[in-house]
Curated annotation (Swiss-Prot):
One of its GO terms (biological process) is tRNA wobble position uridine thiolation. It holds the Pfam family tRNA_Me_trans. It comes from Rickettsia massiliae (strain Mtu5). GO terms for cellular component: cytoplasm. HAMAP family: tRNA_thiouridyl_MnmA. Catalyzes the 2-thiolation of uridine at the wobble position (U34) of tRNA, leading to the formation of s(2)U34. It catalyses: S-sulfanyl-L-cysteinyl-[protein] + uridine(34) in tRNA + AH2 + ATP = 2-thiouridine(34) in tRNA + L-cysteinyl-[protein] + A + AMP + diphosphate + H(+). Coiled coil: none annotated. Belongs to the MnmA/TRMU family. Its EC number is 2.8.1.13. Keywords: ATP-binding, Cytoplasm, Disulfide bond, Nucleotide-binding, RNA-binding, Transferase, tRNA processing, tRNA-binding. This is tRNA-specific 2-thiouridylase MnmA. PANTHER family: MITOCHONDRIAL TRNA-SPECIFIC 2-THIOURIDYLASE 1 (PTHR11933:SF5), TRNA 5-METHYLAMINOMETHYL-2-THIOURIDYLATE -METHYLTRANSFERASE (PTHR11933).
Length: 365
């Protein structure tokens, strides 16, 4: 059993209705803490009722309530639909219209699940907020530090890089040292019906993976056709709207050529999709913005050798970073990397520790 090392406390658990957060609630309850379950309804209930593997709506709210009832803990469902739409869905749509590849789960963790939920937990008089994320918080010489989960297959640190130092002090991640199988065994031990429940999908508000329908619903007539141009400057055809393309895409381009072509750049201002050979995807350096830094301050003109991840599914790559003003950094790979997509996150590591991260901009070379 994982013990948080805290004295008996009042702890709010963010309960999504899945096995992870349910196991956290049961674990903390058994340890004698005063546990309060909170579930956020984040998007249209009607959309979610018939959707498998969603989260934060429909069946999942019911499952969270059933777990809370079994444990005998108070449980509240909070309507966060308007906050979620404003902070996450609208940003998701606007990012695609700007030719970016958005990362809504990070936006949700930053604005809704942490910022707003921590505020609610404090208002309830809670000492801490616990979640089912697979990351670790370790107390260092200068306060709380964020580390990867011990199970590489479930590590979620990439999605939590925007967590602030102040938030880290308040948060608890009881599952950071466990594997998914160990979590399911814990849930079975506690007799929770969700022990074998499948994991939710990444983008909870996109039915059947059709993000274009979400964009067209919120921004009608957003799929304006335009030119597809080769990186060497000649026109190859027409596209059906930049929302249908992402950096590194090969399939579905609808053009014939004598070698495989990939999307290498999207220009929202002139509504142009640029394509080229695989070699054109190589990127040596780029700029990140809105940097959240969790380690010791980097001095101006100081260069730091680190590992970075530019996609959640990619392994870390060696790079050199340097500070550019208050909220920007330059990232330079030791070896060129393919398909660096504006709108995605670049998360910076020193071993298993998360040093910080930021959002990839169009300043790519």
């Amino acid at each position: 059993m994982i013990n948080l090392g805290d004295k008996q406390s009042t702890i709010v658990v963010a309960m999504s209705g899945g096995v992870d957060s349910s196991a956290v609630a049961a674990m903390l309850h058994e340890q004698g803490h005063n546990v309060i379950g909170i579930t956020l309804q984040l998007y249209d209930h009607g959309m979610a009722v018939g959707k498998k593997n969603a989260c934060c709506a429909g069946q999942d709210i019911y499952d969270a309530k059933m777990v809370a009832n079994k444990l005998g803990i108070p449980h509240y469902v909070l309507d966060y639909e308007s906050k979620f739409k404003e902070s996450v869905i609208d940003n998701f749509v606007d990012s695609y219209l700007q030719g970016e590849t958005p990362l809504p789960c990070v936006r949700c963790n930053k604005s809704v699940k942490f910022r707003d939920l921590i505020k609610t937990a404090r208002e309830l008089g809670a000492d801490k907020l616990a979640t089912g994320h697979y990351v670790r918080k370790i107390n260092g010489d200068n306060g709380a530090e964020l580390y990867t989960g011990l199970d590489p297959a479930k590590d979620q640190s990439y999605f939590l890089f925007t967590t602030t130092k102040e938030q880290l002090e308040y948060l608890r991640f009881p599952l950071g040292g466990l594997t998914k199988d160990e979590t399911r065994k814990l849930a079975s031990k506690f007799g929770l019906e969700v022990a074998d429940k499948p994991d939710s999908q990444d983008i909870c508000f996109v039915p059947d993976g059709n993000y274009k329908s979400v964009i067209n619903k919120i921004r009608p007539n957003s799929s304006e056709s335009g030119k597809i141009i080769h990186v060497n400057g000649f026109k190859l055809g027409e596209h059906s709207g930049i929302i249908n393309y992402t950096i590194g895409q090969r399939r579905g381009l609808g053009i014939a050529y004598n070698e495989p072509l990939y999307v290498v750049k999207i220009d929202p201002k002139d509504n142009i999709v640029y394509v080229g050979p695989e070699s054109a995807l190589n990127v040596q350096e780029f700029i990140i913005r809105d940097v959240n830094w969790l380690a010791d301050e980097i001095k101006d003109n100081e260069k730091l050798e680190v590992a970075v991840k530019i996609r959640s599914t990619r392994p870390p790559r060696l790079a050199e970073i340097s500070k550019l003003g208050d909220d920007k950094m330059k990232v330079k790979f030791l070896c060129a990397e393919k398909a660096v997509a504006p709108g995605q996150a670049c998360v910076i590591y020193a071993g298993e520790r998360v040093l910080g991260g930021g959002w990839i901009t169009r300043e790519i070379r």
